[in-house]
């Protein structure tokens, strides 16, 4: 059987490629797969043991994953939720799933909720009360469970032996690392070697259980867990249009961190700003949002949204982290197999410029006007200049921009032999082009292809400008 997000959005394409007719949508009614089974699969507890089957450690590996609602009351053109979860569900029980998880896998520190529009629920107050009662009220803390005991219990129950054999080896390595007595380390290593339990691919359940009496005291000796703050994260964000003082005061009863408020387009600015002020007034000062771009927005509107967040941080004493997120049509046959979509107000050069800036900010923009203005410009004019700027000049701003070095001299104290002012040189030539030549230059720059043969231009002034775009990262780093 094939199902899930891709199969629901691209059902015809999946069937054509595989010959399998996919299941579209949620498994949220009894008998979806087995007519004689009354279980609602979508509401069953998750199997967290699969996280132990691989070497990669997920950043949110110590969180409960859940939905308390499904669907969304909106029908935004850019969003896949109406197709994935077409019917809004006001409430899904959380408490029973957490109790099952705690018993089988041990308690998790955080609660990561994937609801698409929780504020639309008629059961909103009940949902927040349940989250609080499950141990996530304001000020709630978490004491890590005994991972060794969980591992042994699950092996004895024959629950996912593959996962818990790997977990056992991981725990053994931790114990060796934490033991301070070299003789104890050596003795443990030799015992593990003798039992073939140094590596998961040679270890067996039988040998791990046989070592229990010896290993357990060492685990207890080396593991002294301390309490840690718990957090709740409505990871998909909440709808700014539905925020009120009442529902923010209610949300402030749990350890929400961060509060993610959608800011999908500039037309929402008044509603969005009001929602931020209400949240901060309710005591919620750690906020975040995704900023959709490359849809129907103009580039300058992305700057306005980013700037508004930075200004609100300064005024309200809040922390708002913004994550620009490029729109891509996932169910358009022309684009779902590539990343080539360009919005009607955008071009390939602008997209690359945003990505280059975000690489330097690690994909997010937080508080701090000086850092923001260095990355995105002091005003929308500087922002547009950065979008047209050669990519290497964006990435190595300190090397190529003398004006920036002078303006931020308190931070840029190191002088290198490579420092120059090619940015000003490029900009003067760029601005000096006649309107007709500038349009021609922009039409070439917009395609973001500058190798020999990528474009045809015989105008010397335009070619002088385009020469700066041929300077590569390798050129900079090799010099």
Please provide the spans of the model-predicted regions:
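C-terminal non-catalytic accessory extensions
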Residues: 416-479
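Short, solvent-exposed loop/turn segments at secondary-structure junctions
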Residues: 5-9, 27-31, 71-74, 82-86, ...
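Canonical Radical SAM [4Fe-4S] cluster-binding loop centered on the CxxxCxxC motif
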Residues: 59-100, 105-107, 119
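Conserved SAM/AdoMet-binding glycine-rich loop
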Residues: 101-288, 293
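A structural motif corresponding to the C-terminal lobe/cap of the Radical SAM core domain
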Residues: 237, 249-417
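Short, aromatic/basic amphipathic alpha-helical patches
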Residues: 11-19, 126-132, 308, 335-344
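Structural alpha-beta junctions
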Residues: 16-25, 132-144, 280-286, 310-320
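Glycine-rich beta-alpha loop elements in corrinoid/cobalamin-binding modules
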Residues: 1-63
